[in-house]
Amino acid sequence: MDKKSLYKYLLLRSTGDMHKAKSPTIMTRVTNNVYLGNYKNAMDAPSSEVKFKYVLNLTMDKYTLPNSNINIIHIPLVDDTTTDISKYFDDVTAFLSKCDQRNEPVLVHCAAGVNRSGAMILAYLMSKNKESSPMLYFLYVYHSMRDLRGAFVENPSFKRQIIEKYVIDKN
C-alpha cells in the first residue's frame, strides 16, 4: 500500500464507526471570530452576546433575520454522500480567514451543526495548519471538535473530501 492510500485508510478508519454522538445544541467558538452552530443558533444570532457581522447558511433553506444588521450568506448544500462540498472549500476558507483578520464575527451553520457546517469549519482549520504532519493535525482537530460538540462531520463523503484536499494532497 502506498503512503497516500495508507494515510487515507488510517484517517477514515480512525474517524469512522465510532459510537453515535449526540447532536450539538450549543454554539461553539472555533477561533476568535468564527463560530459553529446549528439552525436554532442562527435564528438566535440577532439576540446573541456575540455581535455577528455574518451568518454563513449552508442549509437548503434561504431565510432572513428580521430587525437585524447581520449579513446572511447562503450556500445551499445537501447533506448526502453525493454532494461535492470540496468545490466551496477555497472560497469559504478565504472568507472565514478575512472575518478572523478583520475581527468580524461569523456564525457558520447548517441544520444540525454537524456535517455541512462542520466540514467547512474543519476545512478552514486545516487550511490554517502550518504543522508538518497534516494527518496528525486532522486527527487532533477532528477529535477535539467531537469532544467539544458531540457529533462532528459524520458524513463519510465530506470527511473523505477534506482528507483528500488537506491531508493526501499535502503529502
From Swiss-Prot:
Q: Which SMART domains match?
A: DSPc (SM00195), PTPc_motif (SM00404)
Please tell me one Gene Ontology term that the record gives under cellular component: virion component
Per the UniProt entry, the Enzyme Commission number(s) are 3.1.3.-, 3.1.3.48
A matching Pfam family:
DSPc
Question: Keywords for this entry?
Answer: Host cytoplasm, Host-virus interaction, Hydrolase, Inhibition of host innate immune response by virus, Inhibition of host interferon signaling pathway by virus, Inhibition of host STAT1 by virus, Interferon antiviral system evasion, Late protein, Protein phosphatase, Viral immunoevasion, Virion
**InterPro entries reported in the protein's UniProt record:** Dual-sp_phosphatase_cat-dom (IPR000340), Prot-tyrosine_phosphatase-like (IPR029021), Tyr_Pase_AS (IPR016130), Tyr_Pase_cat (IPR003595), Tyr_Pase_dom (IPR000387), TYR_PHOSPHATASE_DUAL_dom (IPR020422)
Active site per database record = C110 (phosphocysteine intermediate)
Q: Known catalysed reaction(s)?
A: O-phospho-L-tyrosyl-[protein] + H2O = L-tyrosyl-[protein] + phosphate; O-phospho-L-seryl-[protein] + H2O = L-seryl-[protein] + phosphate
Explain the induction of this protein: Expressed in the late phase of the viral replicative cycle.
Instruction: Identify the main location.
Output: virion
What GO molecular function annotations does the UniProt record carry, in alphabetical order? protein serine/threonine phosphatase activity; protein tyrosine phosphatase activity
**Can the keyword Chaperone be found in this entry's annotation?**
no
User: What biological-process GO terms show up in the record?
Assistant: negative regulation of MAPK cascade; symbiont-mediated suppression of host innate immune response; symbiont-mediated suppression of host JAK-STAT cascade via inhibition of STAT1 activity; symbiont-mediated suppression of host type I interferon-mediated signaling pathway
Q: What broad class of enzyme is this? A: hydrolase
Q: Where in the cell is it found?
A: Virion; Host cytoplasm
Domain spans labelled Tyrosine-protein phosphatase: 23-171
State whether it acts alone or in a complex, and with which partners, per the record: Homodimer.
Q: Relate the protein's function as given in its record.
A: Serine/tyrosine phosphatase which down-regulates cellular antiviral response by dephosphorylating activated host STAT1 and blocking interferon (IFN)-stimulated innate immune responses. Dephosphorylates the OPG144 protein.
Q: Please give the family membership noted in the entry.
A: Belongs to the protein-tyrosine phosphatase family. Non-receptor class dual specificity subfamily.
Name of this chain's protein: Dual specificity protein phosphatase OPG106
The gene behind this protein is OPG106
